[in-house]
């Protein structure tokens, strides 16, 4: 804070942990850990008189995540004996609005995903849209000291203040693209330290504030490519960030300067939609396999087990139950794409996974599958004591509802503010 920043921003969410958190409305982060971080950030921001910006609040940015984060913000303000003007920006999209947009042909797939259907929309528990900088800038202009935003384009909360002050949107977004992962763009990388971005008319400088870390041309350039399929063009709300002419310069041991970024506005303003829907209930069992004879013929044995399971439950449609085997140590991470799949490991960590329409059915099928594999015979078997080694007792775990991403599409809008209603309130101690 001695460097006198003009804003403190944090990207608080991601789809990386999977669809469960958006679908269920739960946060993937621990409440006490979030409260600890927000207490430090909010106190520093209020003391310095600068805005605190929280993007994708609660991890996924839907209404329950927003409420969860606002409650923490209020608790922090009360404990600090402070009050603040807090804007929260909603990103939830109603089913009716999206069905209308679908019929008006304003929704298109984002990448290699199927076209959206009315059923996809109706079955989703939460659907959020990814806002750009405009709603955040609007909240700041309305006097917000703290902005708690729903689902955000990751750089948006970092770019909002510079854009509001008239700086290049291209440079502000590119700077935000790197700052959103903090010191991961430094060497050695870490998600636990802050980074400082300083913007001017022609470029920006990134600095690792921890003296044990440093920004290098390689680390900053590499993070520019982070999670992107195209090394030059980075699409986002309202346009495309063009890095074709981008230059990276080492200023000193800890700082890198970036110039040359361009931003091409789209003819039509599009925002990304994300939705998740429940698809059943999951039960898993973890086991180790050490027998080289079993490992050598594992695919055949697992297929035999699967056949026995569905023969035993003859009244169950295969569409009602999904039975999966994940073989860690062989191809558990990459599956059929694993280039070294034929290399026989000395042991395998096996995950038996069942997804069914009820938890009871998932439990039952998983139990039968585990028992069948434990005792099944195979050529060369030397012991009948059991084929599996279980690290836990009980060996099976019920995981509850399973979600999958049901919406990953683009929505064309006339106004970047309309899909994201704002509300201002005073939180903290009573005035």
Whereabouts are the PLM-identified features?
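An acidic, phosphate/nucleotide-engaging active-site surface
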Residues: 93-149
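Short glycine-rich or small-residue beta-strand-to-loop segments that form or flank ligand, phosphate
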Residues: 24-27, 50-61, 146-147, 349-355
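Hydrophobic or amphipathic alpha-helical targeting/insertion segments
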Residues: 53-55, 59-82
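Structured alpha-helical segments in the cores of large, soluble enzyme domains
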Residues: 5-10, 30-48, 136, 271-273
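Gly/Ser/Thr-rich loops at beta-strand to alpha-helix junctions
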Residues: 14-16, 57-67, 151-157, 357-359
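C-terminal non-catalytic interaction/assembly regions of soluble proteins
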Residues: 269-431
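Small-residue-enriched flexible segments
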Residues: 9, 51, 127-128, 157-330
